Design a protein with these regions (language model features):
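A short, well-structured edge-of-sheet supersecondary motif
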Residues: 12-55, 78, 293-295, 322-326, ...
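Active-site SXXK
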Residues: 54-82, 177-182, 255, 330
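Short beta-strand segments enriched in hydrophobic/aromatic residues
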Residues: 181, 262, 327, 336-339
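Short, gly/Ser/Thr-rich active-site loops of penicillin-recognizing serine hydrolases
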Residues: 279, 298-300, 342-361
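Short, surface-exposed loop or secondary-structure junction motifs
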Residues: 29-33, 93-313
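Glycine-rich phosphate/pyrophosphate-binding beta-alpha loops
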Residues: 241-248, 310-325, 332, 337-343
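Catalytic tyrosine of NAD(P)H-dependent dehydrogenase/reductases that use a Tyr as the general acid/base
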Residues: 53-56, 167-169
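Short, glycine/proline-biased beta-turn/loop segments that scaffold the active-site neighborhood
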Residues: 77-96
């Protein structure tokens, strides 16, 4: 039996029954996991494959790729100061380390690699609060957030250091990066992503309706549930804060199209792709960030059990969304487990798949 046939057999005879048992134990308001695995000679899907879902931070790579494509087109440099790229953006209210002038020292590359020194308004430092924090955002479920408003919530929060000095994951980085791309191109942030990423990658069902749709259109959106800290927020306008960092509504198939265009197509040249993917900082054991793309190192999660597994590159979302590509195996793994409470389970599931993908090495 060929390796691809053996892997397909495992998916159907081992993983599918496991997922079915998982579904049988889930609460009624939590749908079955959405899962799609695509590799040469292999295709496995589970759950509502065609149903729309929100990427959460698994959409951050969209912003990074859009920025890199604009750099490739000669419209900007990732190493240029923000004040040079977008002089009309006022950074004076943002927290800074002593002696730092953000307009001169902060670059787009710092933002994309989470090394700006800006705090995260979605999860502010202990003792601080913002209107868009996860604990408070649902007090105004109908509020529409744009990237500039998310960035503005940093005012009053403490600086986390000088640009380039240290890593601190946060949505303000990508919200400000989108503001810069908007200034550089003269387009709305949604149009930047559509023209630089979604359209060239063939992502025909991807967009940001929580920011762009009418109330009637949003209410009728056939989207998978999004559970955050016990609240279901999939149709709330407040989820537009999740678009400020590149988050979008998409499908499993569209995410595979994005990864195919990025890693195996001509969406971006190889040097820029390597720049985005190269791990530079560790968020926590097993999860490392580059300049827009994350890398999972399963061996750091359970060294004795998962050592030697391949290291996929992609994006991870708050409610257990995984969108990853395995370069050596040419495999795509995209999943959505719908809830912040399912993150640990999502990694267990992904690790099981990664162990089997070694058959394609």
């Amino acid at each position: 039996m060929r390796s691809s046939e053996s892997l397909q057999h495992w998916f159907e005879t081992s993983l599918r029954p496991r997922l079915q048992r998982m579904v049988a134990k889930r609460r009624p308001d939590l749908p079955a996991p959405q899962l799609l695995v695509v590799a040469p000679g292999v295709r496995f899907s589970f759950g509502e494959v065609d149903r729309l879902f929100h990427t959460a931070s698994a959409g951050k790579p969209f912003v990074a790729v859009a920025a890199a494509r604009l750099a490739q087109q000669g419209q900007l440099s990732l190493d240029a100061p923000i004040g040079e790229l977008a002089p009309d953006i006022d950074l004076s209210a943002l927290p800074t380390a002593p002696g730092v002038i953000l307009s001169r020292e902060l670059t787009l590359g710092h933002l994309l690699s989470h090394r700006s020194g800006l705090p995260d308004p979605m999860e502010p430092p202990r003792g601080h609060s913002t209107e868009c924090s996860l604990d408070r955002i649902m007090r105004q479920p109908d509020r529409r957030w744009d990237p500039a408003e998310v960035v503005a919530q940093c005012a009053g929060l403490p600086s986390l250091g000088r640009p380039g000095e240290s890593f601190a994951y946060g949505d303000a980085n990508y919200a400000l990066a989108q503001c810069v791309l908007q200034e550089v191109t003269g387009l709305s942030t949604h149009e930047v992503l559509r023209t630089q990423v979604f359209q060239p990658a063939g992502m025909t069902r991807t967009g940001q309706p929580h920011s762009t749709a009418t109330d009637e259109e949003l209410a009728g959106l056939q989207i998978a549930p999004v559970w955050v800290k016990g609240a279901e927020i999939s149709h709330t306008r407040a989820l537009s804060a999740g678009s400020a960092d590149g988050g979008a509504v998409t499908t499993l198939e569209d995410m595979v199209r994005f990864q195919e265009a990025l890693h195996e197509g001509d969406l971006l040249n190889r040097d820029l792709l390597a720049c985005l993917a190269r791990p530079r900082s560790r968020l926590r054991a097993g999860l490392h960030y580059g300049t827009g793309l994350a890398t999972i190192r399963f061996g750091e999660l359970m060294p004795l059990v998962l050592r030697g597994l391949p290291e996929p590159v992609g994006g991870l979302g708050l409610w257990a969304v995984h969108c990853f590509f395995y370069p050596r195996q040419r495999a795509h793994v995209v999943m959505n487990l719908h809830s912040t409470a399912q993150m640990r389970r999502s990694f267990t599931l992904h690790a099981a798949i990664a162990r089997q993908l070694t058959r394609l090495s």
